[in-house]
C-alpha cells in the first residue's frame, strides 16, 4: 500500500472511536471530530488533526517515504464547570495513544506514539468551554 496521510488519520480516529471507556467519558458516539467542532457541538467532544508530516526521517534519501514521523494534536472541549471532566478524558486518551505499537492496524505499522506536549486547560470566554490541547509524535509506516 502506498503512503497516504489519510491512513494515519483513520488509525487515530479508529483507536479513539473504538474505545468504549472514552466514548462513555464523552457521553456517547459522534463526539470525536476532525479539525474543528461545529457550532452546535455536543460537549464534551474531542478533535484530532495532523499538524506536520515528514517522510523517511531515518535516512538522508527521503524519496522512498518508508518511515514517516508525524505530529498530531488532540484537543478536548468540555463545558463542565471544572477541569475534572477534561482531565479524565485526557488521561484515557494517553492510555490509548502513548507507547509503542498503539496505532497498529491492517494498514499502519506504528513504531511508537508518544505524548510530546500537554498544555494546561484554558477557559474559552466565548464558548465557556475548557480547551485542553495535547500534541503527539508518531513514527509509522505502511504495511
Where are these predicted regions, by residue range?
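Acidic-leaning, charged glycine-interspersed low-complexity segments
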Residues: 95-143
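Small/polar-rich, solvent-exposed N-terminal microdomains that initiate assembly or binding
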Residues: 1-62, 84, 100-106
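Short, well-ordered turn and helix-capping elements at secondary-structure junctions
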Residues: 52-55, 80, 119-122
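Sterically constrained small-residue positions within well-ordered secondary structures
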Residues: 39, 63-65, 123-127
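Oligomerization/assembly interface segments of phage tail-like spikes and tubes
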Residues: 64-80, 93, 130-140
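Short, cysteine-centered beta-strand-loop-beta hairpins and adjacent loop/turn segments enriched
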Residues: 55-58, 77-83, 140-143
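Divalent metal-cofactor coordination and adjacent catalytic microenvironments
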Residues: 49, 68, 111
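Extracellular/virion structural assembly segments
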Residues: 79-99
